[in-house]
Each structure stands twice: as C-alpha cells, then as structure tokens.
Design a protein with these regions (language model features):
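Accessory "access/gating" subregions that flank catalytic or transport cores
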Residues: 221-370, 478-486
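Alpha-helical support elements that line or immediately flank enzyme active sites
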Residues: 17-34, 326-338, 383-391
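Active-site-proximal binding-pocket segments
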Residues: 339-347, 354-381, 386-403, 413
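Short, mixed-charge aromatic SLiMs
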Residues: 44-57, 89-97, 349-361, 402-415, ...
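Non-transmembrane, aqueous-exposed alpha-helical and coiled segments at domain scale
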Residues: 2-12, 23-49, 60, 74, ...
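C-terminal regulatory domains involved in ligand/effector binding and gene-expression control
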Residues: 75-283
C-alpha cells in the first residue's frame, strides 16, 4: 500500500533524484548480489549513468551516492562525511567494499561512466550496474531509474536507448504508465483516491478533513503509533535541519561556485531583534495579516543550504525543493496562534496527499518536467498543509494548493554548474512565501475556484512534456549556460 508519508523521506543532499535515488538503486543491486550469493564471484562493478544523471551527476554527487550504495549504505543512515569523501577513500587502495562484505578492485575512471549523449527512453534518469568476475564474464546486470523524490524503479538491461535530445516514443515514459494505473493505495485503504476531485468528494461525503481521511488510509495497514512515530521523525529532522542551517560555521557551499551560506548571518541579524527559534510562544494568527517573510526566507535558506552541503534532510517531495515545506511548517509552528503537535500531523498528512497526486498524475522529477515538478509541487503541498491547519475546508485546501502550483507552471530546471545551489536555494525561499500567500488568498474566499488542482497538475505534465531537454536538469540551457562558473 502506498503511504503519503513516502513523500517525506529522511535522506541526504543535494538531490533526491540524483543522490538519494542512485544510492537506493545501487544498494538494491548490491543486496541482490548478496541474496543470490554472487558477491564472492564478483571481481568488479561498473556504474553507467545516462542522460540527466550523467550531465549533472558530478555536481549532484551521483557517482559518490552510487558508490556508497554499492557499499551497503542507505540515505537515511549513511555517514554523510564518508559519502562526501568516498571517491578519495576508494582511491587510496583502488578498492570498494561491495555490500560491506568484500573488497573488490575499483578504478573510478574506468568503472564510473557518464554517458551524456544517451538516455533511456523510459526516463531521463537511468543507470546501469554490471558485476563481472575475474575473467571479465558478466555475473549480473541491472537497470534502474531514479524517477524523482528518491523513488526508484527497476528496469531491464534491454530497455531501449534514445539520444539525449530525442523525444521518448508515445507511452514510453513512466509518467504515462503511472497515469493509466488504477490506484496505488490497495484494497485495504478505506478511502482510495486518484484525483483531488475524488479526494474532496470523499471528504464531503464522509464528513472528514483531508488529514482525517489520509489518517484512516494510513492506519488501515499499520498502527496509529507507527504512523505517528514516522511523522514525529520527519518533523524532528526538519527542525534539526533548520537549526543546523542557521548555526553552520561553514562559510561557503561545496562544489566550486563558492556560494556563501547566508542563513547563519541572516539568523544572527533576525535573532538580535527576536529569536523565534529559541522560544515557544506564538504570535497572533498571522496568516491573514503578516507573512513574517524574512523568517520564512531564513527557514527555507537554512534547509536548502544544508541540502546543498550534503547534510541530513527530509526529501519534501524532492531535495531540490526540500526547504519549502519545512519553512512553511516552521512558520505555522512559530507564528500561528495555538500551533501544536497535532497541527504538525495535520499539515504533513494533508501536504502528503497533495504530493501523492502530483507524483501519480504527473511527475516530481526535474529531469522529467522541469523545476515546476519540484518547487511547484512543494509550493502546492505546503499551501495545502498550511490551509488545513488554519481551518481551511477541503475546498479551500484545494484552492490554496492550486494557486501554489498555477503560478509555478513552466518553471525550468537549469542549475548552474549542475549544483543544487543557483537558482535552487533562493527559489525555495520565494516558493515558501508564495505558498503562504496562496493560503491567504484561499482563506479570504469560500473555496470556490475556476481552475481545479487536477487541471493544474495535468497542465504541469503537458508543459513538462513540451519543455526542451536543456531546461530539464541537464545544465545545457537557461542560467546554467549564461552564468559563468568562476
């Protein structure tokens, strides 16, 4: 059964599709070698990255993430320092610790291939893992796809390839396959839904809020204690990430652009007047009157800079957009009257339901639909969550979510230097405040709106399909080619 909490996974920066996903896929390959008793036969492993993974893989740490996964690491528990330096560590003796069980010869220049002019037809984020024995005979081969938000899907070694700028054949992409499927919730979910229209209708029919409906689905297959524990863990990491980002002693971000960390200086300046991070008192309900935009900017910058630095974060729903939902949730926590832990639960369940619709009916992958699928989806999710905790009806929640995505349609993914820094970090801050403004507009209305969220999601999907590949996480267009890397 699909859980909406899968939209929030604890992992590492800087990218969910280019760091988290490849690590998960590599770990799965290594685990299958272990399960099939093939580790002892394996003398060498080759990693081939295609399309967007190849074009921006160095900046996103895709190579390092895949190597860490082959060694048996997972994003939620990997030592971030070890992952950051794994290439240098392996180079010390030219070995890699396969599945944590056997040291095999590993020559980075030979065994990591960036295939920049080809991509898999099914998805631009394809990768191939090959294990060979001492005689160079193939032991095992797997193809995997990182489909956004840290989610992966297994392919087949014979999956077709196309040129990097070619349009995939009709029906070849995973987004098409997902759209045609029935439901991801399974028969045990009491309230399955595949569109926002269905979701709001179910809420109205059963007199439930979106969060209450989602809670019923989540607890149909596991205990409420387990669900609450997962939510608490997500919130705990989000809070720690904001705190770390605000107090970091590192002056610049890694990667070569020398982008300064601004959150610590901004925090000191704001805290000199009133340090909201170090107190529990709330101000009056500020949603309709004041956005406290500077603090929201700070929260988003803090998380985004932690992500860019390879720190521990929550994918929400992607790493490139990971600052938006924590920023808006911190806004609720610090600035809204009567904010409480149950409100955090309501916020995340509601936001997760909206994120599920984006993933199911379009894509949350920047390599597939551009940044509208990452920042746009997160803005919509954050708006929905905030609208829910300030008393919005399901119709007002949908309205806020629709406003959040409508004004991010067409947003390109053009990271300078292939790094999740420019324009990604500032873009998170802008979108966080946009989400709050979307809630303000929705709450001043009665929930009626002309454009539905389902229509906006479909529009995002179509826009992404029409978008040129150079604007979809390849660093071959936009700011990526107009800003000189110094």
């Amino acid at each position: 059964m699909f859980s909406v909490l899968d939209m929030f996974t604890i992992g590492v920066g800087p990218s969910s599709s280019h760091t988290v996903g490849p690590m998960v896929a590599a770990h799965a390959f290594a685990s299958s070698l272990q399960a099939d008793h093939l580790v002892d036969r394996t003398a060498r492993v080759k990693i081939t990255l295609y399309g967007s993974l190849a074009l921006t893989g160095l900046g996103h740490g895709t190579d390092r993430a895949a190597m860490a996964g082959l060694e048996g690491n997972l994003p939620a528990t990997v030592d971030t320092d070890h992952m950051m330096h794994i290439r240098e560590i392996c180079a010390l003796d030219d070995t890699l610790n396969l599945a944590g069980l056997k040291r095999i010869h590993f020559d980075y220049d030979r065994d990591v291939v960036f295939e920049q002019w080809k991509r898999m037809a099914a998805h631009p984020n394809g990768m191939r893992f090959q294990a060979v024995d001492a005689a160079a005979s193939l032991v095992d081969e797997q193809v995997w796809y990182s489909i956004g938000g840290g989610f992966v899907r297994k392919g087949a070694p014979e999956d077709p390839m196309i040129g990097i700028h070619e349009r995939p054949p009709e029906g070849a992409s995973f987004a098409d396959a997902d759209k045609s499927s029935s439901t991801d919730f399974g028969v045990e979910a009491p309230y399955p839904f595949s569109s926002c229209t269905e979701l709001v209708s179910l809420c109205r029919e059963h007199h439930l809020s979106i969060a209450e409906l989602v809670w019923a689905n989540e607890t149909a297959s596991r205990s409420g204690i387990q669900v609450r524990s997962d939510i608490d863990a997500i919130w705990r990491v989000m809070r720690a990430c904001v705190d770390h980002g605000c107090t970091s002693a590192e002056p610049t971000l890694p990667g070569g652009l020398d982008v300064p960390r601004r959150a610590p200086k901004m925090y000191r300046r704001l805290a000199s007047n009133s340090d909201v991070l170090r107190r529990d008192s709330r101000r009056k309900d500020a949603v309709l009157e004041s956005s406290d935009a500077a603090w929201v900017d700070l929260f988003a910058l803090a998380v985004s800079e932690e992500n860019a630095g390879g720190g521990r974060i929550v994918t929400a729903p992607t790493n490139g957009s990971a600052g938006i939902i924590p920023a808006v949730l911190h806004y609720y926590w610090h600035f809204v009257d009567n904010a409480n832990e149950q409100g955090v639960v309501t916020f995340l369940l509601t936001a997760g339901a909206i994120g599920y619709l984006f993933k199911r009916n379009a894509s949350i992958s920047g390599a597939e639909v551009g940044c509208q699928g990452e920042v746009g989806s997160a803005c919509s999710m954050a708006a929905a969550g905030l609208a829910a905790v300030v008393g919005g009806t399901p119709e007002q929640v949908e309205n806020a979510a629709e406003i959040g995505i409508e004004h991010n349609l067409g947003l390109t993914c053009d990271p300078v230097g292939g790094l999740v820094q420019i324009p990604c970090i500032e873009r998170n801050a802008m979108a966080a405040n946009t989400a709050i403004n979307a809630v303000r507009m929705a709450m001043l209305g009665d929930g009626s709106h002309i454009v539905t969220l389902d229509q906006a999601i479909e529009t995002m999907k179509q826009t992404g399909e029409d978008m040129m590949a150079k604007y979809k996480e390849t660093s071959k267009g936009g700011l990526a080619v107009n800003v000189v890397e110094c």
